[in-house]
Amino acid sequence: MHKITPFLIAAVVAVIVLAVWLFKKDNKKETWFSRDLNYGKANSKIWNATVAKGLKGIANENAEIRKMYPYLGYGDFTGAICKGPNNQGCTYYANYTR
């Protein structure tokens, strides 16, 4: 065994101990932020409110259209809704449901 070998081994062990100590020294408790959980909850509330408002808007729109087009079309206008009898002022507005 060479004279320097014990010193080299001691130096390597000291470097390893120092590295382990430096990594262990910073023991701060980490708080994890989950983007999926936190943002998902907020987004679901916003999305549900938006959908509810949209459905309410469609229902109001359909109610207005029912008032504006109270007559059902017939003959060539079967499936249409009309403003007056005898197929007057008919439309095939897509969102309208009777």
UniProtKB/Swiss-Prot annotation:
Q: What is its main location?
A: virion
Q: Which UniProt keywords apply?
A: Capsid protein, Late protein, Virion
Q: Name one GO cellular component term.
A: viral capsid
Give the subcellular location.
Answer: Virion
The induction field says: Expressed in the late phase of the viral replicative cycle.
**Stretches for region Hydrophobic:** 3-23
Q: Which function does this protein serve?
A: One of the minor capsid proteins that constitute a network internal to the major capsid proteins and outside the lipid membrane. The minor capsid protein P13 does not serve a cross-linking function between neighboring capsomers, it may play a role in the viral capsid assembly.
Q: What is known of its domains?
A: The hydrophobic region might anchor the protein in the underlying inner membrane.
What is the protein's quaternary organization? Interacts with the major capsid protein.
Task: Specify the protein name.
Answer: Minor capsid protein P13
Q: What is the lineage of its organism?
A: Viruses, Varidnaviria, Bamfordvirae, Nucleocytoviricota, Megaviricetes
